[in-house]
């Protein structure tokens, strides 16, 4: 991801593990989902404007994005320096989880999947990780919206010859139900 939270998290992991000189790819495709007009609002402001039920629908449904963010907003990616090298036609005004999936999975297939015989760290965000889980665990559109991705709890996925053998959260006390293997 290009977002500072994931970069700082990755640096913390690499420093803690004393891993230096690692190949690091910061890719906008792994950024958090773009919440459109909800960007910059706190939860109370969101509820006031849209209502709690609509906010839940925006946040968890597969194909229901919030209203677009105006391109003139200081929160729009077009107005943020870290996005200056991304083609403007690739920068969304809003995204659903489906849109996030359509951004994350091609990147995964091209850049991560070919390296699955190596140890890989993906430092990303709730909805980009949720999109990866949908793909990796073959979850349907209904089940993906109920999948909980706990913040700051690494998910270890063990694969062998491209097949997932095991997946578990490393902090068992804060783990959410994932899948049974």
Outline where the language-model segments fall.
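Short beta-strand scaffold positions
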Residues: 1, 102, 122-124
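Beta-strand elements within well-structured catalytic alpha/beta cores of enzymes
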Residues: 25, 118-132, 157
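Phosphate-coordination/substrate-recognition cap region in phosphate-metabolizing enzymes
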Residues: 1-77, 83, 134-158, 162, ...
């Amino acid at each position: 991801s290009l977002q500072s939270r994931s970069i700082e998290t990755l640096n913390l992991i690499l420093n803690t593990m004393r891993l230096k000189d690692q190949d690091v790819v910061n890719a906008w495709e792994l950024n958090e989902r773009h919440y459109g007009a909800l960007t910059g609002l706190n939860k109370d402001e969101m509820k006031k404007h849209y209502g709690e039920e609509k906010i839940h629908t925006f946040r968890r449904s597969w194909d229901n994005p919030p209203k677009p963010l105006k391109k003139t907003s200081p929160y729009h990616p077009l107005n943020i320096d870290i996005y200056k090298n991304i083609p403007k036609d690739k920068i969304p005004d809003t995204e659903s989880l489906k849109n996030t999936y359509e951004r994350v999975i091609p990147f995964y297939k091209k850049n991560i999947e070919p390296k699955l015989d190596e140890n890989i760290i993906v430092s990303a965000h709730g909805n980009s990780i949720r999109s990866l889980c949908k793909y990796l665990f073959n979850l349907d559109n209904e089940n993906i919206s109920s999948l909980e991705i706990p913040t700051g709890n690494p998910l270890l996925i063990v694969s062998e010859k491209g097949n997932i053998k095991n997946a578990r959260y490393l902090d068992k006390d804060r783990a959410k139900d994932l899948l049974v293997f």
